[in-house]
A protein has these predicted regions:
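Anionic, Ser/Thr-rich low-complexity intrinsically disordered regions
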Residues: 25, 177-180
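Generic intrinsically disordered, low-complexity segments enriched for polar/acidic and small residues
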Residues: 40, 60, 70, 128, ...
Length: 246
């Protein structure tokens, strides 16, 4: 697990939650990974109580599953969660792009151009994690450049499951980071040229790709088609008991 320094004013629970969540969405802790509150507490030099509280919150957010008698695990990817995150992002970003094409600040354009150069540097050096950060920040800068930075806060908080599978897609080598970088450049051109329809088309292509292709490459990372992992594990516990009673 990767260590993240504690932020000023951050409680022990908040810090533990941020560390575990970042490791989950960046796939340092892949879907299905066993989690130990004792080991996490030792890693962060915390007591187990705030770590347990953090895991409870992550379970509510559907990033962690707790199974009695079995343990705590990183949640498998659920297509419904992914599609919900994609939907939220497409709806809010599309509306923001319309505004950006109408009016975009000069400082915002400069910031996007600088971001694109840093993305290229990350590509050249093979720094995938850095590229993903800059990718997210590019979209935040679009929101900021048209006066809607708080919209990005809503998007980012509600599309983390989508981000996790997008990270997996890049890791798997399906659609490369160069492809996303190229689309970012096209988005900036469309915004500066006030070409709303073109910008919306680019965004649609940027966010729309088949989750099933990722699932085919990493089937063990996803929930089953008609039965979640939690139900599967529950049945694996119950079935022997029922069979023994017959």
């Amino acid at each position: 697990m990767e260590f993240l320094h504690r932020l000023g004013g951050e409680s022990s629970r908040e810090w533990a939650m941020r560390v575990v969540l970042q490791n989950i969405i960046h796939l340092v802790l892949p879907p299905g990974t066993s989690l130990s509150d004792k080991e996490i507490a030792s890693f962060l030099s915390l007591s187990r109580t705030p770590v347990r509280e953090a895991l409870v919150l992550l379970e509510e957010m559907r990033f962690v599953d707790v199974y009695p008698q079995k343990g705590t695990f990183v949640s498998l990817l659920d297509v419904d969660d992914i599609e919900e995150g994609r939907y939220i992002r497409k709806c809010l970003e599309s509306d923001t792009l319309i505004q950006a094409c109408r009016s975009f600040s000069a400082d915002g354009a400069i910031a996007l151009e600088a971001n694109l150069k840093m993305q290229q540097n990350a590509l050249d050096t093979g720094d995938r994690k850095r590229f993903l950060f800059l990718d997210q920040d590019f979209h935040r800068l679009i929101c900021s450049g048209c006066g809607r930075e708080r919209v990005w806060s809503v998007i980012s908080k509600n599309s983390l499951h989508f981000f996790r599978v997008r990270r997996l897609k890049i890791k798997g080598g399906g659609v490369g980071q160069g492809y996303f970088h190229e689309q970012h450049g096209e988005l900036l051109e469309a915004i500066l040229a006030h070409e709303t329809d073109r910008a919306l088309d680019i965004l649609n292509r940027h966010l729309t790709w088949d989750v099933e292709t990722v699932r085919a490459s990493y089937p063990d990372y996803f929930t089953r088609d008609s039965m979640s992992k939690k139900m599967y594990m529950f049945m694996s516990e119950v079935a022997p008991v029922v069979a023994g009673a017959l």
